[in-house]
Amino acid sequence: MNVLLQELFIIILSAGKGKRMFTSIPKVLHKLAGKPILQHIIDKVLYLKAKKINIVYGYEGKLLRKKIISRGFSLNWTLQSEQNGTGHAVQQVIFKEIGNDNDKILILYGDVPLISINTLRKLLYSHSGFNISLLTAVIDSPDGYGRIIRKNGKISKIIEHEDALSIDKNIREINTGVMVVNRYYLRFWLNKLLNKRNKDKEIYLTDIISIAYKSGNIINSVQPEKVFEIFGINNRFQLMKLEKIYQIEQAKKLLLNGVTLSDYNRFDLRGTLKHGKDIFIDINVVLKGSVIIGDRVKIGNGCVLKNVIINNDVIIHPYSIIEDACLDSNSVIGPFAHIHSKSKIKKNVHVGNFVEIKNTIFGKNSKVGHLSYLGDSDIGKNVNIGAGTITCNFDGKKKNKTIIKNNVFIGANSELIAPVIINSGAVVGAGTTVTKNINRKDKIISRIRQFSILRKENNSK
């Protein structure tokens, strides 16, 4: 591990109520790309291998702990019962935590989800030889942000937007809030803020900058790799904007790595994607969780894939939903198919339109063309399932299994009442209700006999 990161402690400020979100849950639990805003930050800082990660929260602590995944790292949760500013939030941790004077304290914000690990490493590595380092950014529209004030090129203070003079508001270098401070100096400077509050009776963390400057410290600063990394979320419009930025960035990476997207503005990745070569993804496709796609796969418009493995040369026609499933090579799915609940589709299979497959193994070279439901089933090779076939797997108390062995033909509009076994080579006639096991190569049919009803002619005039 790099020496610069060995003494690293992280504080993530997440106590804001998100009033402008008009919500009943903590702002940092609202989702960006399918996971909580705060989770984006945590997932990145875990790569820094800090000694401790402290999350300062304001309310709904139980809900936060439930929704946030620690990925095996022990997160420390600190309550800021009264939201009295960013300085007050950091005080809740730094005055209670025991550590070495030389510890580096990285301060982040739970509502700034797109900051990159490369930018954080850049900030940490540049901190060597300084007591305090800031992440600043130069942006075209700095309204709402605190301005960086420099004297002779050196940072001397930060002025909040509402306190800035007209001349200061022309400054385009802004404070992102992200900083690294040595523990001794952070504690020392925060002590000086104990009795210093703004007009809203809040303690601003940014006030330590002027204290540091006046005591002879040089305030180090670096810029993010990309400006959008420092954008925060205070309302749902800003959340939507960052969602769009995030999705376009993901799409660019995929395009540059050989994936063809029909329209990168209409692609949605809400998890992770591992992919092979020569993949085509049409518009309005949503990928969730862990998605693994092999070579030469084609995915039609409007499909939703969640926690799936798709092997080589699979074609998925439009508006198919595939969740928690594995598709073997050379299969053709959809349109409007629904495959889910640990189903496994073997090689060279056809699953047609309006077919639902749940918790089922569907064997090699088998076909189910349309309008069928196959649940809790084990289906062999070379099986043909006719239109309208359903497995009746639930008896009111438990799910029961249907087993269809190799080379079976099931006629259209058949009902298979589980538990039932249809042995190899059997033929089930159209419209049959199967209530008991069928022997090998048997041909069975059970349907109401067709008959005519004679109508008397009406001779009345």
From Swiss-Prot:
UniProtKB keywords: Acyltransferase, Cell shape, Cell wall biogenesis/degradation, Cytoplasm, Magnesium, Metal-binding, Multifunctional enzyme, Nucleotidyltransferase, Peptidoglycan synthesis, Repeat, Transferase
Binding residues for Mg(2+) = 111, 234
Q: What does the Swiss-Prot or TrEMBL cofactor note state?
A: Binds 1 Mg(2+) ion per subunit.
Query: What cofactor is this protein dependent on?
Result: Mg(2+)
Pathway this chain belongs to: Nucleotide-sugar biosynthesis; UDP-N-acetyl-alpha-D-glucosamine biosynthesis; N-acetyl-alpha-D-glucosamine 1-phosphate from alpha-D-glucosamine 6-phosphate (route II): step 2/2; Nucleotide-sugar biosynthesis; UDP-N-acetyl-alpha-D-glucosamine biosynthesis; UDP-N-acetyl-alpha-D-glucosamine from N-acetyl-alpha-D-glucosamine 1-phosphate: step 1/1; Bacterial outer membrane biogenesis; LPS lipid A biosynthesis
Residues that bind acetyl-CoA: 387, 430, 447
Query: Which InterPro entries does this one have?
Result: Bifunctional_GlmU, GlmU-like, GlmU_C_LbH, Hexapep, MobA-like_NTP_Trfase, Nucleotide-diphossugar_trans, Trimer_LpxA-like_sf
The segment annotated Linker runs over 237-257
The GO biological-process annotations, alphabetized, read as: cell morphogenesis; cell wall organization; lipid A biosynthetic process; peptidoglycan biosynthetic process; regulation of cell shape; UDP-N-acetylglucosamine biosynthetic process
| Family matches, as SUPFAM superfamilies | Nucleotide-diphospho-sugar transferases, Trimeric LpxA-like enzymes
Question: GO CC terms for this protein?
Answer: cytoplasm; membrane
On whether Transferase is a keyword of this UniProt record, the answer is yes
Q: Where is this region: Pyrophosphorylase?
A: 1-236
Gene Ontology molecular functions: glucosamine-1-phosphate N-acetyltransferase activity; magnesium ion binding; UDP-N-acetylglucosamine diphosphorylase activity
| Annotated residues for binding of UDP-N-acetyl-alpha-D-glucosamine | 27, 80, 85-86, 109-111, 146, 160, 175, 234, 358, 373, 384
State the HAMAP family in the record. GlmU
Q: What subunit structure does UniProt give? A: Homotrimer.
* Record function comment: Catalyzes the last two sequential reactions in the de novo biosynthetic pathway for UDP-N-acetylglucosamine (UDP-GlcNAc). The C-terminal domain catalyzes the transfer of acetyl group from acetyl coenzyme A to glucosamine-1-phosphate (GlcN-1-P) to produce N-acetylglucosamine-1-phosphate (GlcNAc-1-P), which is converted into UDP-GlcNAc by the transfer of uridine 5-monophosphate (from uridine 5-triphosphate), a reaction catalyzed by the N-terminal domain.
Family to which the UniProt record says this protein belongs? In the N-terminal section; belongs to the N-acetylglucosamine-1-phosphate uridyltransferase family. In the C-terminal section; belongs to the transferase hexapeptide repeat family.
Q: What is this protein called?
A: Bifunctional protein GlmU
* Upper classification of the organism: Bacteria, Pseudomonadati, Pseudomonadota, Gammaproteobacteria, Enterobacterales
Quick one: which gene encodes this?
glmU
